[in-house]
Amino acid sequence: MKSTSHGTLLFDGDAELLLCHATGGRHWDIPKGMADPGESSAQAALREAREECGLDLDPHALCDLGQFTYRPDKDLRLHAVLIERVDPAQCVCSTFFTDRWGRLRPEMDDFRWTPFAEVHDRCAKNMALVLTRRLSLAAVLEGLLAGR
């Protein structure tokens, strides 16, 4: 059975997306993760944005973009929100893992506003395909700006 990861696309008004760097990896990602028992997709996406970026988002501003095939064993349910541009240095990840040397490390260790044109190069292949081929980031932003 496929699992589903719930994520949020964090847009500013300047056609950039806030991406998070996965600690120990070479790629950038969006805040996302599995839903806790009894949690809706929107609740999981909001929680992941809070845990991985330190951002408390308005649940009423969240736009459900739908579910996308992400990997053979996992789907990706995406939400989008337009936020005031935050200083990436103020973002803080509050979820941790133990690395192979026994050190406690944050899941995300850096944050960056990324122009849409650079998303494909920064993200892992499957995420890049969802964000640049299955979605139009420009169209999503246009809808958010129009209040749809």
Report the location of each language-model feature:
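N-terminal strand-loop-strand
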Residues: M1-I30, H79
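Short, charged/polar surface micro-motifs in flexible loops or helix N-caps
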Residues: D14-L17, G24-R26, D36, P72-D73, ...
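Membrane-topology and secretion signals of cell-surface/extracellular proteins
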Residues: D29, S41, L55, L76, ...
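A generic structural signal for short hydrophobic patches within well-formed alpha-helices
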Residues: A35, V119-H120
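Active-site-adjacent beta-strand/loop module that shapes the phosphate/pyrophosphate-binding cleft
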Residues: F68-R100, R112-A117, V130-E142
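Functional cleft and adjacent loop/helix regions within the main domain
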Residues: R26-H27, P31, P37, L78-V81, ...
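A generic fold-level signal
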Residues: M1-S3, D12, R71-D73, P106-M108
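The catalytic Nudix box helix
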Residues: I30-D64
